[in-house]
Structure formats: structure tokens, C-alpha cells
Amino acid sequence: MRKYLILLVLIANLGLGIQSFSAMTRQERENLEKQISEAYDRDDQKKLLPLVTKYVNEFPNNADYLNKLGVLYDNLDNYSEAEKYYLKAMERGNYNAISNLAYVYYEKEDYEKAIKYYNEYQKIADNTDNYFWIGASYEELEDYKNAKEWFLKVTKFEKDGSSENRLGLIAENEGNQKEAIKWYLASIQKGNLWAYDNLAVLYIGLGDYDNAEKLAKKGMNLAKNSDDEDLKKEFRETLDIIQAKR
């Protein structure tokens, strides 16, 4: 699942930036904002970082732009800088930064902090895009009860089968192979390619090499046009294991 980062322009936050001291004239500020807007329209990441940094240096109390800068650093996997600017944005009242910070902690594998900030954000707004990552954080902590609760919520609206695949993995970790097969098949029904490999591996463990091979080959064929090289590697390794077992 693609990571979800919120970039919401809040007029109130812009006001905060305008009020802070700056040597910029009004015209210079408007020109800078126009350049930033155009860079976002072109998705020009190289220009965005220096432009938004310049804006934040001029207007350090603008919560919206602090959050934007955090997102830009997050996209560069510079989590320490992302964390710094998200915290500053939060201090100045940007609620979206709370959710973004939670995801940074997930990326840093600090799952307890991720859950803490996701829960803090959920008190403000019920953002369903966060459900999967809350479940994933609990799963990483092996708190399967809470993980299942959140993943089950996601199954009601998401379309890529990621949560069903995770429920399959949890069931398998709990030793419930029947339940795992059920969830992997549900994930496959939604087109999730990782579920093909996970179910194939489960069948290998059961000694059902025919079904394992069918799933791995079908999954590999479907993954031909995918950019996910890790997935393709998994299918190749699974097929190698099947051949070695026979």
C-alpha cells in the first residue's frame, strides 16, 4: 500500500506565516508562493525542497509550510528532518502533521510511537487511510488481537487486498492454516499478488506442491508488468523451492 501523506493547505496557517517577521516584501512573498505552487503542479521535487525551505526560513511560524517541508524530507527518507518539521508544525496547530509523524515512526520501526500518534490523530478525525498502518504497527509488535481488529475494518472498504493478505499472515503465525488460506484467497480475489506467493509458501509447508506451483506461476505471470522487483524475486525463489522439493 502506498504510504499516505496529507498536504492540506489551510488559510489559517498561511495567516500565521504572514504575521511572522520577514524581510520579504509582500510582492516577494507572493512570487515565492507562486513558484512553490508551480513546482507542486509539476511535481518538481528538486525545486520544491529549496523553495519551501526558503519560505519556512522567512515565515517560521507557518504550520502548513512546516508540514509541507516535513513531507518533502519524508519523501527523501530523511526521517530525522521530517520528524523535526512535523513536530514544529504540530506545535503550531497543524493536525495533519500528527498523522504524518505517526507514519514516520512506522518507517523508523518505532511502532509504539506510531500507534501513539495515530491514536492521537484519530481523536481529532476518523481518517480511514490510517487504519491499515495502525493494524500494521500492532502486527509488528505481535499484538495480533489489535492488529486483526484494525485490518478487519480495512477489509470493508479497501480494494487491493492488502489487509486480507495481512490477516492471512497473522492467521498463519497463529498456526491457523485454514483461516490463513481463507484470507489469502480473499486477498487474491482482490488481485493482491503477494497473497499468491504467501499462499504458495503455505501449500509448500503442507506438501501440496501442485497447488503451490500453480499459484506461484500464475502470480509470476501476473507480476510481469509490475515494477515490484522484490515481488518477482519472491516468486522465483518460491518456484526454486518447489523444484528442489520434488
Please annotate each region the language model reported.
Residues G205, N211-R246:
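Terminal, low-structured helical/coil segments at or just beyond the last alpha-helical repeat
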Residues G17-D64:
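N-terminal leader/linker segments that initiate helical-solenoid repeat arrays
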Residues N61, G93-N94, A125-D126, E158-K159, ...:
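Short helix-capping/linker turns of helical repeat alpha-solenoids
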Residues N67-K68, N100, W133, R166, ...:
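Canonical tetratricopeptide repeat
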Residues D41, N75, E107-K108, E140, ...:
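Register position in tetratricopeptide repeats
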